[in-house]
């Protein structure tokens, strides 16, 4: 931006994909009846004690490794003290002094093709707060979310545009999704983004007052929020005024940021060590084992799909936009070697059905076994693309029959026996002798007419390539 350099730091809160909460055995499940998944620990009953969720620590280690972070094997927790209705204990268990991950990085590719490494300052484990629902001038609290395991991932203030912020969050989301660390559904709050934005004159190394924008729930809103806030701050600075340090929220309706509160003084959270959780020394062999079993990331799959399976970059990218689609593709290619055909069918007719019904592929009846069977039958010349159009609607909506059973029941097998095709053609030629008189002047029309009658008699169940070879021979025999 003219005259000013944009400084952006990103903080992401990511809900961990665990069955129970971070420090209690309460079940984790989105969308349940409010306040039905909170126990005595979540509600801070006197005398209750936290216990660390081992799975949550494993997921944090996976995330640290994928983000090229230094992993601290001494696990400690701290208390962040503040009073607010969504926090029954009066404090949050977090990792202020000793985060599990430090000094990481993530590479993004800009629209112009240039690469940029985004430095990540820290990753720490903490617990979520209760969900607040504002309605009819009242605030309702749902403690189902209270205590759910989170990792907070904080970048250094190294991003310089809305594009970089969006690409960073998109890439981070992809990594965490393919690691199965989180379902990262921004619309459900399992990936929440806060931005810290400030402007400074070009050439200056001093940071100006930053404005924090809270809880952005989509990539498009991140873009809009950054662009609006940059323009708002620029207008203030061009008037020789000072940008006030504030916390703001993004308004979907007006595509603008709105003041929540001013930060005149920094809040003192009086951090101190969590006395109810002793330091835990993680076994390095256990950490190494978790890392060695890390799932294949999308970037690794992308390279394999193109270099080993022969997919185009475009097809590989489309497959990898959905974890469900990727998993389905992986299962299917174990059952057939026509990898390109699998990809083409997934991203064309199958994706069209998913878009129409607003579903993911795991929500329909289609199985990898049935899709692979269709492709294998085509490759073996048992059915053609025409028969496929009959079979596909059935297997997309039902899994009670195998493809082979459907083909048999509907008599869809291609006739490939040359003797059988010859007999059929001879009968048609004998019934259309007058056509042969036109063969010398209009051969294509004669062949097309006879082939049309052949397809009509067999419901299209004749291999057209074999039939085309035979029809010319049979016509010439009868001239």
Swiss-Prot record:
Catalytic activity: L-glutamyl-tRNA(Gln) + L-glutamine + ATP + H2O = L-glutaminyl-tRNA(Gln) + L-glutamate + ADP + phosphate + H(+); L-aspartyl-tRNA(Asn) + L-glutamine + ATP + H2O = L-asparaginyl-tRNA(Asn) + L-glutamate + ADP + phosphate + 2 H(+)
Keywords on record: ATP-binding, Ligase, Nucleotide-binding, Protein biosynthesis
SUPFAM superfamilies named among the record's database cross-references: GatB/YqeY motif, Glutamine synthetase/guanido kinase
InterPro entries: Asn/Gln-tRNA_amidoTrfase_suB/E, Asn/Gln-tRNA_Trfase_suB/E_cat, Asn/Gln_amidotransferase, Asn/Gln_tRNA_amidoTrase-B-like, GatB, GatB_C_1, GatB_Yqey_C_2, Gln-tRNA_amidoTrfase_suB_CS
GO MF term list: asparaginyl-tRNA synthase (glutamine-hydrolyzing) activity; ATP binding; glutaminyl-tRNA synthase (glutamine-hydrolyzing) activity
Main enzyme class: ligase
A single GO BP: translation
Coiled coil residues, start to end: none
Alphabetized PROSITE patterns for the sequence: GATB (PS01234)
Bilayer-spanning residue ranges: none
Enzyme Commission number(s) of this protein: 6.3.5.-
Source domain of life: Bacteria
Gene3D superfamilies: 1.10.10.410, GatB domain, N-terminal subdomain
NCBIfam families: gatB, PRK05477.1-2, PRK05477.1-4
Functional summary from the UniProt entry: Allows the formation of correctly charged Asn-tRNA(Asn) or Gln-tRNA(Gln) through the transamidation of misacylated Asp-tRNA(Asn) or Glu-tRNA(Gln) in organisms which lack either or both of asparaginyl-tRNA or glutaminyl-tRNA synthetases. The reaction takes place in the presence of glutamine and ATP through an activated phospho-Asp-tRNA(Asn) or phospho-Glu-tRNA(Gln).
Family: Belongs to the GatB/GatE family. GatB subfamily.
HAMAP family in the cross-refs: GatB (MF_00121)
Subunit organization: Heterotrimer of A, B and C subunits.
Name by which UniProt lists this protein: Aspartyl/glutamyl-tRNA(Asn/Gln) amidotransferase subunit B
